[in-house]
Amino acid sequence: MLEDPLENVLNVVAHCLPMEQAVAVWDSALNKNLIDYPRLQRLPFNGVASQVLANVSRFADSGLESFVRLRLAWLKLRIVPQAWVLGHRVDYLIGDRLILLIDGSQHEGKQRRLDNAHDFELRQRGYEIIRVGYVEVMFDWPAVQLKIMQAIGLGMHLKKR
């Protein structure tokens, strides 16, 4: 059986998939520790692969998070992926107190109950929460972006004085 090295696969992915999808695949390889960022930096990628490399992050827990990170990059605000807030990781902390949570397609049961309890605690402590799901991110991004922009416009990302 022949196997192509992961580096070659990632290069092909960069050239064959749209940017968001390619970045999500590369993010996943980093997140799963299949390769590390210094190794990627040493490889002679060019063209679109070097653009993908410039956009990767090992902090994306899912492809959805990769898509969202890329779609929010233009905001030029402090956006912290996988931030620890009140003892739990949140998908994104925007500014000082706006939290963006992204639920995958299988978000239910015990995990959902735990998330609801954490949401309540976050709100009690002055954080603002936007929770979106798979369908919204993948098929209704303009509505998600509008929610985020409205929250920022209202200053919900800033510390209360």
Q: Residues of each region from the PLM?
A:
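Surface segments flanking catalytic/ligand-binding clefts of nucleic-acid enzymes
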Residues: 30-161
